[in-house]
């Protein structure tokens, strides 16, 4: 199961980086906690390489936690808008260094604006 989770985390991260190219240069360690059935799986994600290990990430600048079922649902289509909705509704929570969180939020908002402008032109 954790091997599957590692692959899903890596695929989700690389897919989101493709949708938000401005985040690709960001070097960041993210701690990920997946809660489910009475236990918590902890992973360490290194960006931009999308390298995932099953480990406690003591050096993480950003920490993300969610239920395993929610993670599975989000990675099924791996769309930025679905991830954003999960953060807004509290199904996914992010904590950590405020500057990183604000930077990521600003970059995502600018990417959304670019997408809206593209659609408006067509």
Identify the role of each PLM range:
Residues 1-122:
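Feature captures hydrophobic
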């Amino acid at each position: 199961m954790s091997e599957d989770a590692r692959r899903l985390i890596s695929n989700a991260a690389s897919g989101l980086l493709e949708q938000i190219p401005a985040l690709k240069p960001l070097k960041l360690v993210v701690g990920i906690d997946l809660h489910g059935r009475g236990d918590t799986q902890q992973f360490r994600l290194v960006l931009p390489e999308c390298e995932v290990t099953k480990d406690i990430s003591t050096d993480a600048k950003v920490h993300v936690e969610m239920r395993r079922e929610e993670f599975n649902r989000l990675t099924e289509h791996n769309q930025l808008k679905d991830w954003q909705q999960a953060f807004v509704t509290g199904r996914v929570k992010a904590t950590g260094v405020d500057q990183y969180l604000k930077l990521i939020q600003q970059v995502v908002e600018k990417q959304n604006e670019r997408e809206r402008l593209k659609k408006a032109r067509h």
